Amino acid sequence: MSMFRAKKLDLGCFTNVRVLRDHSKRKAFLEAEPERQALRYVIRNTTLPARTRAVAQLQLTQMHAYTRPTQIRNRCILGGKSRGILRDFKMTRYNFRMNALMGNIPGVKKASW
């Protein structure tokens, strides 16, 4: 019965349904990005016939929503939260502060002047 078991994902962070959904969105976007870029180029190329551009527009709109880059949301690698994320460290503000105070983040220390 192990063939029906879900595949193990090596996300390396806290896992809940939202994190799993975000992971699948990132995979779908990565696979479909070259096709989306090609279709967008065809749509914006005014030297091509209008019918070709319209067909490309239709194909682009029929692609799955998860292939859009706006569907991807930055999430904390420690807690899975999606708000208050520091982009450079991929952590929420609170987790960043706690890790910085404990000295777990190299090159970061509390400011004093």
From Swiss-Prot:
It comes from the Eukaryota. Keywords: Mitochondrion, Ribonucleoprotein, Ribosomal protein. GO terms for cellular component: mitochondrial small ribosomal subunit. Its main location: mitochondrion. GO terms for molecular function: structural constituent of ribosome. It is found in: Mitochondrion. Pfam families: Ribosomal_S14. InterPro entries: Ribosomal_uS14 (IPR001209). GO terms for biological process: translation. Gene3D superfamilies: 1.10.287.1480. Component of the mitochondrial small ribosomal subunit (mt-SSU). Mature N.crassa 74S mitochondrial ribosomes consist of a small (37S) and a large (54S) subunit. The 37S small subunit contains a 16S ribosomal RNA (16S mt-rRNA) and 32 different proteins. The 54S large subunit contains a 23S rRNA (23S mt-rRNA) and 42 different proteins. Belongs to the universal ribosomal protein uS14 family. Component of the mitochondrial ribosome (mitoribosome), a dedicated translation machinery responsible for the synthesis of mitochondrial genome-encoded proteins, including at least some of the essential transmembrane subunits of the mitochondrial respiratory chain. The mitoribosomes are attached to the mitochondrial inner membrane and translation products are cotranslationally integrated into the membrane. This is Small ribosomal subunit protein uS14m. The gene is mrp2.
